[in-house]
Structures are given as structure tokens and as C-alpha cells.
Amino acid sequence: MKYKTALLTMVCTLCMSATMASPRDTARVEHLSMWNQLSAPLLGNPALHGATYDKSYSEMVLSVDCQHQSEAFVEEKGKGHVLGALAVNSYLRMNPRSAVWGSASYTTGKQKSICWNSTSDYELLAPYVMADTLGGDTHRERYTFSGGYGTQLGRVLLGGEMAIRAEHEYRDRDPRMRGIVTELLLRGGAGLMAWHYRWGVLAEGTIYKQTNSVDFYNELGVIPEYHMTGLGTEYGRFAGEQRSLAYRGGSFDIAFDAVPTGNEGLYGHVSLGRNAYERLLTSANSLPLSRLIYNKVETTMGWKQESKHHWAAYAHFAFTKRSGDENLIGKSDSQYYPVIGKLTMYKDYLMDASIGGMYGQQGGDRSWMVSLKAGYRNHRERYVYPERLLDRAHAYVKVAGEWMRPMSRRLSLSLGADAGHYARVSDNMVMPFANMTSKFAEMIRHKYRFVKASYTEAHLHARGDYHLKSSSIGLFAEVAGGMVLCSEREQQVGLRASVGVTF
């Protein structure tokens, strides 16, 4: 209830600030144009975010998002979802040197047919999740709040931002999983205007907590819960009755940015980060079972020019190394389990390199853009002993286009489309299937089938904005749909519909 009260308060506050908004069409194009994808890394630095847009723009949106897969591409994430959301986003230009922005959202719905995962935030915590062979649908509720401020003092740029996420995921039939997540993010940024550039530096940190448990109301239907350790392995000593976990951790990132203040020039972004998450068995006096560590590096460099025709070319590289430490647990004494050592057993390497470009026109209340991107992606997972390996590589190409234009004094239209293809280049698997149970072997074969597959995707979206007479308030409706075709003769379809208010 307290989250809903806070959400309503923020919505009302932002609506009261609507009188600060600038002309709708020009602001809409400035904030929503595809050209802004080039500036996406800069928005992470609140000092640069405060100088990114000239005009205020706010919107409140109610949406429904549906997705269905004929067979789960990733069993741990399920076969699809039905989610409804209410969100408000606002960027207010206070004066030529200062801006404030904020957002709030509430999302609720159902995740369908999850298997081999009883823990929330699978993508963040994998492979160290609790799992069973039955699974089922889960219900989700998520609240998010964020706010930031950026200002310019002479040639110095300063900014700060805070964001909070609270999430509850549960199942109302056996096995009754429950995950309660809280995450706090803090950002601080600084910048300098010099030599026709904005130079920025960012420091960012998160604090993460999750409590996770599984219960059975039918004593005759109890099945084991496994504490997974990667690539079909599990902590067998604590499987079965130990069904309460906690996750504690966080992250720290630094980033450096450079963007030209004029209409053309080189731009660049470099970020370094580290995440660490510890898994604790709360049903055994908070025994630490494992620790997952991320080390990340990402860089983008390109050239952009804004004139009658906008164009840009860039190169991007990202690398993430994840390693998992498993604790060696000694003999218990009165429910106390001593940790006598640790071994780094799980290793995961993900590399993505790409080049791309964008071309089009953007001015005032209209815009059109096309983009092309091509790259190579390699993902390698390894478990040290007994040796297990899952390696795959894909080459990909993506193309996208967007058209935004006023149709009359009150009606504006936006159309967009994108398509992509991920082609398998190589794959390799090493697994001791002779020593694996049939359920675990089936799970690994399913995973290998889809991670090595090739994929083709296409998406369309259309949005109409209607501006009320003699008012800065507008109404809009948007519909988007897409399809993903898998070379394993499976597919995914999705549809999203939204209505909202701009101010």
C-alpha cells in the first residue's frame, strides 16, 4: 500500500508541473526520436543527462504487454507473459542550466510456464538459483521510482540520481515459490565543458537484497528443490528440505564520456563495472553457499553530424566475465556449518562486438531515420569439474527505421519497424551425460538446442498523438507487435498496446 501511495503522489506532482512543458510536437521528436539511441549511454550520467534535452516532456502511460513462445527458449524464464503497467516519466527543463527528471511505475501480471527456476531475477543471479522439475506460472508485482537533477555552474556540470525497485513474485500452487526483491541505485556525475566537448565522469552503485523460499501445502506432493551451481550441476548436500535462501550483494560502476557541444564530432563512452552477489541458506543459519562475481567493460566510439541530414557511424565492444565460487562446507555442529574453503567452479564469458550507422533528418516537429548494425557475439560457459562446456557464437545484422510527422495541427503520427537475423557461426558442448540423471540431461539438451539456434526477428509499431485545443496536454495511443522465428521450428509472438497522456 505504501508503494501505491508513493506512486500516486509522484504522478500528481508531475501532472501539476505540466505547465512547464514546451510545444508538444517539437518536444516529442526531441525526446522520442531514434536518433537519441546514440545518446543512450550519456543518460546514465546525471550531469550529462541534465544537458541532453532543451525541452520539457512528460507522459503517463497505461499498457498491456503479451508474449507467447511455442516452446520456451529459456525454460528458467518461461514461455511468455501477460503484464499490465502504469508508468509516468517526466523531464522538466527548469531553466537553461538546470533540469529535473523522474519516473514511477507499477507492473503486475503473470509469467507463464517457468521451469527449473524458483528464484526471482534469474538473468542477474543465474546459475545460482533454486530450482525444481515442476515449476509453473508465477504472479509478479513490481514498483519502481527514480528521480534525478542536473545543473551547470559555469563550465562545470553536476548531477545526481536515485532509483528504487521493489518486486514480489510468487506462485499460488505447489511448489509455492516466493521471491521478494529490493534494489537501491545511486548515481553521481560530473562534467566539464571544454575544447568544444562535454567531458563526463560517472560513479554508480547498487545495493541488492532478495529473500527466496519454496513451500508445499500438499505433503504428499513434495518434490526436491535443487540449489543449482551451473550447467546441470547442483549442491546435492542441501537438496530437498532446505528451501529458504537470501541473496545479498550489489555493484559498482564507473564511466567516462565525451560528446561534442556542436553539430559534429567524435563521441565516446567507456564503462567499467563489478557486481557481487552472495547466496545464503537461511534455513541453515544463513550459511553462505556461493558467490557470483561479474567483471564488465564496455566501450563505444563514433562520429556524428547534425545538419540538414543527420548521420553517424560507430563501433561498440562489450565484455562480461562471470565467475562463481562454491564454498566447501564442513561437518555440522548444532546446526552450525563451518566454511572450510572455496573453489571457483563456474566461469562464463560473454563478448559482443559490432559496428553500425544511422542516417536521416530531424528538425522541429518531424523526423525520419534508418539504421544498420552488424556484429559478432560469443558466449562460453564452463564448469571446471567434472568438466562441462557450452560454447556458441552468432553473427548478426539489424536494420531499423522510423518516421515521425504531424498530420495536422492536432494530430501527429509515428511509425517504426525493425528486423534482425542472428546466424549461428559455431557451437560446442561437452557434458558427462553418462553420469547425469535423466531430468538434468533433458534440461541441458533443451538449453543447448536453443542457445545454438539461429533466430530471425521483426517488429512494427505505430503511435498517434492528439493535442487538445488551447492546452499543453495531449493524448496518445500506441500499438506494437513482433515475431521471432527460431531455426528449431519454434516461434515467439508479442503484442503491446498503450494509451496515455502527454504534458
PLM region descriptions:
Residues 93-97, 152-156, 193-197, 261-263, ...:
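Outer-membrane beta-barrel channels and translocator barrels
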Residues 19-112:
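N-terminal, post-signal peptide beta-strand-biased segments of exported outer-membrane/organellar beta-barrel
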Residues 56-62, 99-104, 156-162, 197-203, ...:
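Transmembrane beta-strands of outer-membrane beta-barrel proteins
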Residues 62-68, 106-110, 153-155, 164-168, ...:
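Transmembrane beta-strands of outer-membrane beta-barrel pores
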Residues 491-503:
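Outer-membrane beta-barrel "beta-signal"
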Residues 86-88, 145-147, 186-188, 254-258, ...:
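Membrane-embedded beta-strands of outer-membrane beta-barrel proteins
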Residues 233-374:
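Long, internal scaffold/assembly segments composed of regular secondary structure
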